[in-house]
């Protein structure tokens, strides 16, 4: 744990001490209307761009379908209730 903390501290110290040049021309272009994109990479509008969507019943809980393979009947049970005897 101490080694990880020391490594993170060293990386931060190097990053803070590294000189950064100020590009005045780029700052002027960025402030004005420019054709630069807001982000450097394209983000897909939905999470599944190259594969089909997940199955509908339990898309967020795949473990539920694996651990509970009990079939659910579509109709009501045919046995009469105890009060109807």
UniProtKB/Swiss-Prot annotation:
Q: Where in the cell is it found?
A: Secreted
Question: Keywords, A to Z?
Answer: Glycoprotein, Secreted, Signal
Q: Where is this region: O-glycosylated at one site?
A: 75-83
Q: Write out the tissue specificity statement of the associated record.
A: Abundantly expressed in tonsil, lymph node, and trachea; strong expression in prostate; lower expression in thyroid, stomach, and colon.
Q: Name one GO cellular component term.
A: extracellular region
Q: Where is the signal peptide?
A: 1-17
Pfam families in the cross-refs:
FDC-SP
Protein modification: O-glycosylated with core 1 or possibly core 8 glycans.
Kindly report the protein's main subcellular placement as a broad class.
Answer: secreted
Job of this protein: Can bind to the surface of B-lymphoma cells, but not T-lymphoma cells, consistent with a function as a secreted mediator acting upon B-cells.
What is the name listed in the Swiss-Prot or TrEMBL entry for this protein? Follicular dendritic cell secreted peptide
Q: Which organism is it from?
A: Homo sapiens
